[in-house]
Amino acid sequence: MAKAAAFFAAVVMLFASCVSTNVDDGQQDNSVSEQTDSAKKQKTKKPKVKKKKFTQEAFDKAYAEGDYASCVAMLNGKKHGKDKILDALDTNMLMHLNGQYLDSARAFMETQWEMQQSANDTSGGKSFAATIAGENSTTYTGTVYERLLAYSMRAVNALALGDVGNAKGVVDTYAGDYKDVIAPLVAQEKALEAESENALETDDVSSALKSLQTVGVSVDLSSVNGGRPAKYTGKPYEHSAFLSYLGALIYAANNAPDHAQDSARLLREANPSISVLEDLAVPAGKGRLNVVALSGTIGKRCQAAQEFSTGIIPVLNTPLKFKIAYPAFPAQDHTISSVRVTLSDGTAKTATVIEDFDEAVKIDVAKKARGAYNRSVFRNITKNAATATVSITALIAADKAVKQSEGSIMMQIATQATYAATVAGLNAALNAIIKAEKADVRQGSYFPHKASAAGFTVNPGTYSVKVEYLSKDGSVIETKEQGDISVVAGKPTVVVSSCGK
């Protein structure tokens, strides 16, 4: 109850604080009473949710045209099932791309709460048990990198509103939440993978193999095991370079140098090539203008599938077929290659990549592929044992009846018909097992591909910024401009820009 109260209190604080679009010193322009009145209005007058009928074709068309409002409305009108959190993550990002920064910030906070509640109800063992029916039968609760991106996007939305005070609140919350939110999820994923590693050594598999042997099908697992993905031994993704970068800038903008240094240390651990020294040590009499650019959409995982033939089905003399499905991360082809930032004083820079989120997906897939493969083999064995054992027994009996059929022609025809129906039923059942086997490739689709930044040491004053999103050949894909940016001496001023192409 305490966590719930804290969460809804935070929502009210968000409504109250995200009202100024030109705040660079962490102070709110409104009085306390005005904030309270604003919060009450927000609390009593929730915006009406617009809904449209969802079709994939219409959604893809709207997205290609940059009609993010229609995309949001279609996701709101979609039946979510076990993908409620997944659809919420996409909706929240699309609201950001549509410039609905306050709505997006609030929605990300609510989604984080739902993600945590779902995760609290799940353990590694429960997840393994839930996947017996199929990988996609489980409720989607989000990945570690999506949890971290949710914090980042809340901070980005606050910065887009010019509210560095609320942005500080977000990074403060992350620092306090890590042990209770991120660390348990990491432990839960490790527990699932550990249980999956031993999936083929369980009593369920041993019993299933024995059942198949009783009807003459001997399964050779050596060929199946040969295609198993390697166990991931690389560095786990437990911290975000981008979130640490934002933390360093936000704390510096809020006159919290010690916390800024803590974030800078985490940034060095996540991405040693990035330095925020110039951002944290602004020369006397100078200001610092940092332009953060989110470009493209995050790379997508796909299904990898391997088919194996093992054992021989009696009577039919055909092999038993397995389909093993698991996630993979193929080479990606992104539209935006780089970002160029130009200030109104003519200064220009190519933005430095702070984080490529494809790497987070790649790590997530590599960590999960082996466990998913083992669970897929588990399902193939146990489902075939449950289905094929009965059907093969019936097939053997029907074949015997055909060979021994005597009597009238009608009786022989009936026996032949029974045999044919048994064969058809067996084939249909085996094909259904193969058709049902699918990898879980769910993920948020509209998070950015890259977070980049360009920092400028400038004289205090008012500036405008032009952000150009460039293709591999240097041609401009899209240009975003912002004006009336006030830069003060001694601290960073942060501007954010996004392009989802």
Language-model features: locations:
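Bacterial signal peptide processing site
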Residues: 19-22
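Short coil/linker segments at helix-helix boundaries
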Residues: 98-147, 151, 161-244, 253
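Short loop/turn and low-complexity linker motifs enriched in small/turn-promoting residues
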Residues: 285-501
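Generic helix N-cap/helix-start motif at coil->alpha-helix transitions
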Residues: 48-55, 82-87, 111, 146-149, ...
